[in-house]
Each structure stands twice: as structure tokens, then as C-alpha cells.
Swiss-Prot record:
Its main location: cytoplasm. It comes from the Eukaryota. The keyword Transcription applies. Part of the nascent polypeptide-associated complex (NAC), consisting of nacA and nacB. The keyword Secreted does not apply. This is Nascent polypeptide-associated complex subunit alpha. Residues 10-75 form the NAC-A/B domain. Belongs to the NAC-alpha family. It comes from Dictyostelium discoideum (Social amoeba). Residues 120-159 form the UBA domain. GO terms for biological process: protein targeting to membrane; protein transport.
Amino acid sequence: MADSDVKKVTKGEKKTREAMKKLGLAPVSDIFRVTIKQKEGVLVVVAEPEVYASPSGETYVVFGDHSFDDIASRLQKAVPKANVDDIVKAAMPAPTAVKESEESEEIVAQAVDSFDYKGVNPKDVEVVMKETKASREKVVETLIATKNDLVSAVLELTTN
């Protein structure tokens, strides 16, 4: 075996493993990934973990290299990149004639202009509608409930 294949065990890890044996923790096989979800959408991911279970089966000890994945910040970064013009174009059907296209644009514009947004930014409503496929009314209600927080609104609409 090459030196790079041999795993170095630290003194602290060695003591921890001895203590786990004394407590009766048994190794659990066939676990390839451990994901722990924390508040605010933060995920702690351990790839190739060593997992030990207590005899009661309710407590686990996980060894391995971990990484953090913040879903909320990724979603928040993606939301400003959304282009409202692309959203409106995607929502409209393909025109069969130029005249029909102009008429449908006027109808959509009138419908959007006549809708009561209740103090919510129409662009925010369009972005959330695109991400969640929810109705305009539901999006406005959710944005009001979340105090115009786009990320919270998207998460609430997609989890319900």
C-alpha cells in the first residue's frame, strides 16, 4: 500500500473510538451520505461517513468530512437573475399572427395593470409566480404575509 492510501488517525479520534466501544455503539454499514437539515435551509452534508448507532437506535455518531450547503442563499441569488420580460414572454402563448399578438399583449397588460397588488411590487409578484407556478392572488397574499421576502414566499408556496 502507498502512504497516501493509509488513513492517519489522530490521538483524539482514537480516544473517541475507544469511548464509543465502551458505550456499546455499533458501526452501521451501507450508509453513503448523511444530510442534516438545520434552520434557515442550511444543510450539513457528510459524504462517505462512518456511522455508529447506540443500542437504543435513537442516537447516531457520524464521522467524516462535512460541507455546508445553504439552499436559501442559493435561491436568493437565483431570484434577482430572473428577467421579468422573459417571464411575461414565456407566459404568453405563441402568436399566430402579428395582430393577435399585439391584442393579447394589450389584454395581458390591462389585466396586470387592473390587478390590485396591495402595495406589493409587481416585478416581485412575477418572479415568485415564475418560480412557484402559483396564481397571482396567492403570490400577493404570500408576499404580504412574508413582508415582501421573496425567498420566504417561494419556500412557503413550494412547500405547501
